[in-house]
């Protein structure tokens, strides 16, 4: 073909593709679009094939998605060019010319050129090739060659081997996506519960059912009519969505990125409500479709399993349940049984038999159907209530039972408030799972505390949980702690009301109701205290102890808090947070067990403990008496006994040095480093230090800023490596100790800070920066709270602005939650003057302006 003809054909093809998109956008018939798009490409390729006189020389075959006539706007075109035994020079040149022309038309093609024997070898070697050819379709050329190919495909297809290979492939893909489809930007093709999981059903179906089509799933009683119709509806939903996604992205994009979610919601005519954005409502439907796909994929792959064993074990204490393939299954005689009265019996039996790893497909379908029939009569039935609580009180498979229940929509049907948060995403810059998935992750984390083989993860939590008398209380607290998300208002208070209703309905003991209610109301208190306040201050511990009241509340809240934070995102939890929570638990427990010690007594004990540590280094009290007197009494409120001992060892011979003293050490928990700064007090110490740590790639997790009675700054910084890497710590420590002295002594102004770009997530959700300033009691100290999206350079920028306003920082607690920063500072105006409201408002506006 001459260049002019190619350009004309390319223009014609582009126009036809555009018309197909226009028709789709008008009618929203994705199935027709995919077929028509495939047929358009069929005609185009056949025309090229014919013009190059390849018709009698080789066979052109469509494979994969193109083979099953599901060609999306920007999908690759998979082709097999089947040749006779070998390629001669003329045929090779023609095929090369054909592929070149296809690319010239702007089509994205993936192709292979093979003869029958080569294809047979590839089918046996690679299950991906076998799968692609399972959906092959003749386009043009030698039909005899194509018939031979179909014969080879059928001869080499061993259903059992194919099934095992595809299951392994699916498991690997799910692992790649962290076993969760409920993340913020799911891949609607590859993520668990996406189109690939629907295609898996077709591939396995084709391998074991002759002339398989989806309608046979209903005809052969693999699915009832209702589930079959929902399967078809879900398939259409995903296909329409993927077409739209390609259109707005203008490329082969299968991830529902934040940038596209609102655009898609607009195209699909979602409307915002009082408490939900249109994109959130759209994503809720996406997650519901994912949820159903995950469920139906499991059901049908179990039903279509060609290597299913006929071995059945009867269960003595149940006349309608059997064990088959290590699944708990419904006896075929009771296939049409009304299982609603026995829903919870199923899970009690599942927990009882250790060899059971899941439920059988027929039982799953029955449970899914029964979920729709749960009503108030069922919920008020004392027998059913006792069974549900029995499942939670079991020592076996609590997490697995609840996950299967949720898969079958049973939890949301039994606890309607839970049903409202199923598939609901949390757009708060740190939760990456839907609310129901997060809640189940919390329960899974609680269950991990019980396992001896996982004791190394959290030894203290393991010991506390093993000795915890009523574990079901913690599971119920986890179920309800976020149950009121998305309603507007304080979800902790609203969730507590849901607990009261559930407790009243289920006749929970008053003690259990009171503890669960308190845990739901207070589930954020411990993390807030640990991450925002100074735990070395006895007054902070005293205030927290007043809130928790007793050891039972403290232990319960500690276990729930650790499990909760770990369930938000893999990026939120770290050893720093673990240490903060552990220390708060330890200090508060000590306070509760010792009784109400006065602040003076607490400080006296702290001095005694520090002195004992120093004594092990042969440092007597007369060595550091002057140093401690110069530090003043407030110093002992600021630092722990271990920190006091360390600092005293370093400084007792340097009470008033002329040059800054910098010392660095590893943190005791093994994560991060501590940097001590001791020098004559001047302005901008904190600011210069922030800039230095930014430059060397360390983020400040916490800072204690203290001024001694003889006007020396004694500051302690806890640092985390922003980009963990292998380093020589000895060299790093020497570098910091030398370089930071120079920075602090220089009179040069620090370079203006430039914030890094916002993350896509923060940009999409337009997270509003929140800043508040409140006076601490009647003192000249003010608490500054800043909540914003986290970016490199943020702390330096805040410090720059505070320096300009003659405001000094006495304490900083830096809390990073995924992409969100929640930073708390204790600050003082110059000369400890009090700030009036105008000054406070003005400072808030200036900080917002520089952070924005």
Locate each region found by the language model.
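Non-catalytic interface/linker regions that flank or bridge core catalytic/transmembrane domains
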Residues: 1-62, 69-71, 77-431
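Divalent metal-dependent catalytic cores for phosphoryl transfer on phosphate-bearing substrates
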Residues: 69-94, 219, 233, 434, ...
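Short, conserved secondary-structure transition motifs
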Residues: 114-124, 519-528, 719
């Amino acid at each position: 073909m001459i260049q002019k003809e190619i350009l004309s054909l390319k223009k014609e093809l582009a126009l036809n593709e555009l018309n197909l998109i226009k028709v789709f956008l008008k009618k929203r018939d994705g199935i027709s679009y995919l077929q028509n798009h495939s047929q358009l490409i069929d005609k185009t390729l056949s025309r090229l094939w014919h013009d190059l006189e390849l018709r009698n020389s080789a066979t052109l075959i469509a494979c994969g998605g193109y083979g099953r006539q599901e060609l999306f706007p920007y999908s690759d075109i998979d082709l097999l060019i089947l040749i006779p035994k070998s390629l001669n020079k003329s045929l090779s040149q023609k095929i090369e010319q054909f592929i070149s022309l296809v690319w010239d038309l702007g089509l994205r093609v993936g192709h292979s050129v093979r003869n029958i024997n080569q294809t047979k070898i590839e089918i046996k070697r690679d299950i991906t090739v076998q799968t692609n050819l399972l959906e092959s379709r003749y386009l043009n050329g030698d039909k005899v060659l194509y018939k031979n190919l179909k014969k080879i495909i059928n001869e080499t297809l061993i259903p059992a081997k194919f099934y095992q290979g595809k299951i392994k492939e699916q498991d690997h893909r799910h692992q790649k996506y962290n076993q969760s489809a409920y993340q913020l930007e799911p891949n609607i093709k590859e993520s668990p519960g996406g189109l690939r999981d629907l295609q898996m059903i077709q591939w396995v179906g084709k391998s074991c059912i002759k002339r398989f089509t989806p309608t046979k799933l209903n005809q052969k009683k693999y699915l009832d009519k209702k589930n079959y119709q929902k399967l078809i509806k879900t398939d259409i939903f995903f296909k329409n969505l993927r077409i739209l996604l390609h259109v707005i992205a203008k490329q082969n994009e299968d991830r529902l990125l934040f940038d596209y979610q609102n655009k898609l919601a607009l195209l699909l005519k979602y409307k915002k409500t009082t408490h939900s954005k249109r994109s959130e409502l759209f994503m809720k439907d996406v997650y519901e479709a994912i949820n159903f796909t995950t469920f139906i994929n499991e059901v049908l792959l179990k039903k279509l399993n060609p290597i299913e064993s006929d071995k059945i074990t009867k269960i003595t204490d149940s006349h309608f349940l059997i064990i088959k393939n290590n699944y708990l299954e419904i006896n075929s005689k009771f296939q049409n049984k009304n299982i609603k009265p026995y829903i919870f019996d199923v899970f009690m039996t599942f927990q009882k038999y250790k060899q059971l790893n899941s439920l059988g497909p027929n039982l799953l379908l029955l449970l899914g159907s029964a979920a729709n029939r749960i009503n108030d009569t069922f919920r008020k039935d004392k027998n059913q209530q006792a069974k549900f609580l029995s499942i939670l009180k079991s020592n076996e498979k609590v997490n697995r039972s609840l996950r299967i229940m949720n898969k079958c929509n049973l939890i949301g049907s039994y606890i309607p408030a839970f049903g409202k948060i199923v598939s609901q995403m949390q757009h708060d810059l740190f939760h990456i799972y839907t609310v129901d998935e997060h809640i189940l992750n919390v329960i899974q984390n609680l269950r991990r505390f019980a396992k001896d083989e996982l004791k190394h993860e959290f030894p203290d939590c393991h010991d506390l949980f093993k000795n915890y008398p009523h574990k079901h209380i913690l599971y119920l607290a986890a179920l309800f702690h976020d149950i009121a998300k998305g309603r507007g208002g304080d979800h902790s208070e609203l969730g507590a009301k849901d607990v009261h209703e559930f407790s009243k309905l289920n006749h929970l003991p008053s003690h259990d109701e009171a503890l669960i209610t308190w845990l739901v109301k207070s589930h954020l208190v411990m993390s807030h205290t640990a991450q925002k306040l100074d735990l070395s201050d006895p007054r902070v511990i005293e205030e927290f102890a007043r809130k928790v009241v007793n050891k039972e509340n403290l232990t319960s809240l500690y276990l729930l808090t650790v499990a909760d934070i770990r369930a938000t995102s893999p990026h939120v939890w770290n050893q720093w947070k673990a240490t903060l929570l552990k220390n708060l638990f330890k200090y508060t427990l000590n306070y509760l067990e010792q009784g109400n010690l006065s602040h003076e007594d607490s400080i006296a004990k702290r001095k005694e403990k520090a002195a004992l540590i120093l004594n092990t280094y042969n440092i007597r009290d007369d060595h550091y008496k002057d140093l401690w007197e110069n530090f003043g009494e407030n110093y002992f409120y600021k630092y722990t006994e271990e920190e006091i001992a360390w600092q005293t060892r370093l400084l007792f011979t340097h009470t008033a040095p002329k040059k800054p003293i910098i010392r660095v050490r590893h943190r005791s928990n093994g994560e991060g480093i501590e940097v001590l700064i001791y020098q004559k007090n001047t302005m901008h110490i904190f600011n210069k230090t922030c800039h230095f740590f930014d430059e060397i790639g360390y983020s400040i997790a916490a800072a204690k800023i203290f001024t001694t009675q003889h006007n020396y700054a004694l500051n302690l910084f806890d640092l985390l490596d922003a980009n963990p890497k292998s380093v020589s710590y000895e060299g790093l420590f020497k570098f910091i100790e030398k370089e930071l002295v120079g920075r602090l002594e220089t009179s040069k102004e620090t370079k203006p800070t430039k914030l890094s770009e916002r993350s896509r997530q923060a940009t999409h959700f337009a997270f509003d920066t929140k800043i508040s300033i409140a006076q601490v009691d009647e003192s000249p100290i003010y608490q500054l709270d800043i909540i914003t999206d986290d970016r490199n350079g943020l702390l330096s920028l805040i410090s720059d602005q505070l320096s300009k306003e003659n405001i000094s920082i006495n304490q900083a607690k830096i809390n990073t939650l995924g992409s969100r920063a929640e930073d708390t500072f204790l600050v003082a105006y110059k000369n400890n003057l009090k700030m009036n409201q105008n000054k406070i408002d003005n400072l808030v506006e200036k900080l917002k302006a520089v952070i924005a």
